[in-house]
């Protein structure tokens, strides 16, 4: 292995070594805001109270799993500065039914990281659209002003416990 930059810029992966994240299974995923800033709302009377960005995040979660038939959302929780998902990546050739109980085909599962990057991107795009539409004087999210922390935290759920 080459010692480019003396490993100064190397970021260690927190993924499970030798695990294929495109394999079917159950995954517990956590996405965190950059700087752990409370972008999504606040806790009041032991309940999460979404702000406008939190509502956008909630809508995008629902939409993401409506369009991604290869994934099944078991549970999710939006907190002020992070989101927890319990996601099942379906086996190939599983029959899925639409809202009218009609069987539909779905594409072979992609990886969990594909879902995470797509979800993060769609949230940023929707939030930026909201900033424009509401004519709010706050900076849009970009590389210099990120909404999300890099990467995500995951646990592979290996049993029902």
Where are these regions (language model features)?
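Short catalytic/metal-binding and nucleic-acid-binding patches
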Residues: 1-161
């Amino acid at each position: 292995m080459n010692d480019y930059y003396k490993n100064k810029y190397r970021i260690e992966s927190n993924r499970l070594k030798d695990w294929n994240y495109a394999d079917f299974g159950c995954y517990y995923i956590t996405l965190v805001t950059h700087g752990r800033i409370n972008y999504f709302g606040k806790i009041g009377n032991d309940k999460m109270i979404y702000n406008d960005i939190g509502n956008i995040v909630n809508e995008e979660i629902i939409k993401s799993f409506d369009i991604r038939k290869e994934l099944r959302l078991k549970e999710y929780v939006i907190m002020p500065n992070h989101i927890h998902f319990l996601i099942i990546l379906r086996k190939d050739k599983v029959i899925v039914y639409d809202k009218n109980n009609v069987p539909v085909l779905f594409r072979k599962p992609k990886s969990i990281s594909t879902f995470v990057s797509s979800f993060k991107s769609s949230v940023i795009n929707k939030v930026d659209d909201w900033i424009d539409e509401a004519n709010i004087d706050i900076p849009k999210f970009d590389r210099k002003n990120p909404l999300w922390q890099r990467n995500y935290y995951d646990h592979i759920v290996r049993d029902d416990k």
